[in-house]
């Protein structure tokens, strides 16, 4: 029976703690560390105060193709790709660093970001397996996540250059709200004076 290294176990615990703090699911923890499932559950409960969520990991590439999710996924993956190509880091450390960069750029509007860490990790695995790839937009030349061999060459247009109509409607609603609030505040100031 091989004896486990105490140093390696400490590194795995530290990595698991960092992943849990970023919202990793149990399956990701099991895949990226050598800790037992029981120890990971115990660690998760200790850090989060509740057991890890149950259920399967996302296994479809469809989620990454909807317009808003695609923009967020592409931002994350471009950061990840940059870190890998420039030798900054590799493996799960590259996922963590690029996810932190993503969080800095896309501050969540609610309690949780649109792109969760486990989904970002799954995206990396989808690209590595050839199910998804980065494709260049014909208009802006930005690199976006797209299914491999799905689009004819040189015909891809990203959802920033050609947003779907529901995205434009949502943008108009939010702009109207931003226009309305200052007027309401001005009226409140006039009534107070």
Swiss-Prot record:
Keyword Flavoprotein: no
GO BP field: bacterial-type flagellum organization; positive regulation of DNA-templated transcription; regulation of bacterial-type flagellum assembly
Pfam families: FlhC
Top-rank taxon, per record: Bacteria
InterPro entries tied to this protein: FlhC
Compartment(s) of residence: Cytoplasm
Alphabetical keyword list: Activator, Bacterial flagellum biogenesis, Cytoplasm, DNA-binding, Metal-binding, Transcription, Transcription regulation, Zinc
Record has Cytoplasm as a keyword: yes
Note on how the cofactor is bound: Binds 1 zinc ion per subunit.
Cofactor: Zn(2+)
Broad class of where this protein is predominantly found: cytoplasm
UniProt-listed NCBIfam families: PRK12722.1
Family the UniProt entry places it in: Belongs to the FlhC family.
Its biological purpose: Functions in complex with FlhD as a master transcriptional regulator that regulates transcription of several flagellar and non-flagellar operons by binding to their promoter region. Activates expression of class 2 flagellar genes, including fliA, which is a flagellum-specific sigma factor that turns on the class 3 genes. Also regulates genes whose products function in a variety of physiological pathways.
Protein name: Flagellar transcriptional regulator FlhC
